[in-house]
C-alpha cells in the first residue's frame, strides 16, 4: 500500500476537521451507521482495514468494536461527488453495528400517522455486550 497521504487532501473536511461517514454492509447494502472521522481516523482506517472513527463526545479515536468485539472490516472506501462524505463498505463482524444490540442504528421507521416504530429486533442485550 502506498504511504502517500495526498488522497486525504482531496477530502473536504468541515470546520472541525471532520468528515461524515456512512458505514454500509458490503454483502447486503444495509446502511449500518453514521459517524465521523478526522484525518487520522480515515488514514488509520485505510492503513489497518478496520473502521476507526472520531468520537466527538469523548474527543478521541474510537476503534469500532474495541469494547463490543463488533469490529467493521473495511471492504471498500468511497467518497461522494462533492468529496465531503465518505461511504465505507464493511463486513460487520458479529452482525451487530448498533450499541443498542441491533444490526443497524437505523432501526426506527417513520409511519404515516407521525410515529416512529421500531422495526428491527435487538439481537443481543447491550448489558451482555458491554459488561
From Swiss-Prot:
Chain residues that bind Zn(2+): 81, 98, 105
Any single Pfam family the record assigns to this protein: PRA-CH
Biological process, per Gene Ontology: L-histidine biosynthetic process
Entry EC number(s): 3.5.4.19
Catalytic activity: 1-(5-phospho-beta-D-ribosyl)-5'-AMP + H2O = 1-(5-phospho-beta-D-ribosyl)-5-[(5-phospho-beta-D-ribosylamino)methylideneamino]imidazole-4-carboxamide
One GO cellular component term noted in the UniProt record for this chain: cytoplasm
InterPro entries found in the cross-reference section: PRA-CH, PRib_AMP_CycHydrolase_dom, PRib_AMP_CycHydrolase_sf
Keywords: Amino-acid biosynthesis, Cytoplasm, Histidine biosynthesis, Hydrolase, Magnesium, Metal-binding, Zinc
This protein's name: Phosphoribosyl-AMP cyclohydrolase
Protein species of origin: Azoarcus sp. (strain BH72)
Lineage per the UniProt record: Bacteria, Pseudomonadati, Pseudomonadota, Betaproteobacteria, Rhodocyclales
Amino acid at each position: 500500500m502506498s504511504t502517500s497521504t495526498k488522497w486525504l487532501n482531496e477530502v473536504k473536511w468541515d470546520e472541525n476537521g471532520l468528515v461524515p461517514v456512512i458505514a454500509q454492509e458490503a454483502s447486503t447494502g444495509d446502511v449500518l451507521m453514521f459517524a465521523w472521522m478526522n484525518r487520522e481516523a480515515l488514514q488509520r482506517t485505510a492503513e489497518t482495514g478496520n473502521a476507526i472513527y472520531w468520537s466527538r463526545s469523548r474527543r478521541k479515536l474510537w476503534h469500532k468494536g474495541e469494547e463490543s468485539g463488533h469490529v467493521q472490516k473495511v471492504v471498500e472506501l468511497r467518497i461522494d461527488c462533492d468529496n465531503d462524505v465518505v461511504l465505507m463498505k464493511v463486513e460487520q463482524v458479529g452482525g451487530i453495528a448498533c450499541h443498542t444490540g441491533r444490526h443497524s442504528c437505523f432501526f426506527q421507521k417513520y409511519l404515516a400517522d407521525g410515529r416512529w416504530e421500531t422495526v428491527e429486533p435487538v439481537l443481543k442485550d447491550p448489558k451482555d455486550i458491554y459488561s
